[in-house]
Amino acid sequence: QLLIPTDNSSVADFHQACKPVYKAVLSLRLLDKLCIDGSILTKVPYIAEFCNDKSGIDFQQFQAHDIQGYQTFVEQVKIPLVMAALLQDIGHFHPEAQNIVCGQEGQLNPFRMLAVDDRKALLQINYRSTIKFLIEGLGAPIYRGNSKAERNIFNATEHKKLLFVKSMLKAAVAPKLGVGNILKVPQIYSSIILSTKANYNYKLLPKVFNALYQNAERGICCPKVVEALHKITGDFPMGYGITYIPHDEHGQNHDQYEYAIVTQLYPVHVNRPICRIATRNLKFISHGQDIVINENFNLHYADIARHFSSLSKERLNEISQLLWSNYQERKPLGLMPRFWHTYDYFSFKNNQKLWDKVN
């Protein structure tokens, strides 16, 4: 979202490469959130064994109060969860899957919309091949040492971890209300935010949860898990370019707009992103402050944009000229930007200092 152009032909390749890690991080954050909320999904025996069925408050203080117990939780639950997220689509690289995706001669666009039968076949091949890769390709690590007792404990522990990864991959295929949602919901979210499809539309990313809640209504995933992820990410994904109307201490709007970048998770309100400002007084800056952008000042919302459209065309042209040296080339984008592409800004190394001191 920051360094990758979001409006050219290379988007799909970059998104495909970034998606597994993006999904893995979201799965970790979602697991933490569900543990804090005391979700029934975290009461499955394997997970509960390592967090000792802690209450939400206890889980938040887990690392501080029980360093060894938390480290065990990381090794036995969190790392296997990351493995599952990273491996979830590894079966797509199986030759049979590649024949479907790319064609026998590699002549087809791998990011095209697949026919229903091809998609079903691909899902089956992916699952079988992923499990085979996990069990026969990776397997459990080998104990190195001379203690028979330690070896027995090590082998039993690693076998349980491997079975947990396998169970998560299986549960994510059709999770319904089960533990597989910890993988499935971030998978759906990532497939939209980092879409590889030709109809990818950056402007529509803040509507991602419309699709997720629709999936929940159809029984594809758990509504409560969708809601939990929504509270983590908010409506606006990290790295999204927000265009907003600044106002003074009396709440009076300025006759200009400014740019900001969504930089944090866990907004208090899902429609009020936590951002780092990228412009001040219509000039790009490399060190901005954190602000929460109220929906009443966010040009993403049509009502706010319509209200602000009372500005004259001359003033809007003036703003564009002050912000962009190539404003003539940007005219096709319109004078009233509802969002902005942050890669333009982050392509300059000095501007990457914007991340300094982010909480």
Q: What is each model feature region?
A:
Residues 1-128, 132-148:
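Acidic/His-rich, divalent-metal-binding segments that scaffold phosphate/diphosphate chemistry
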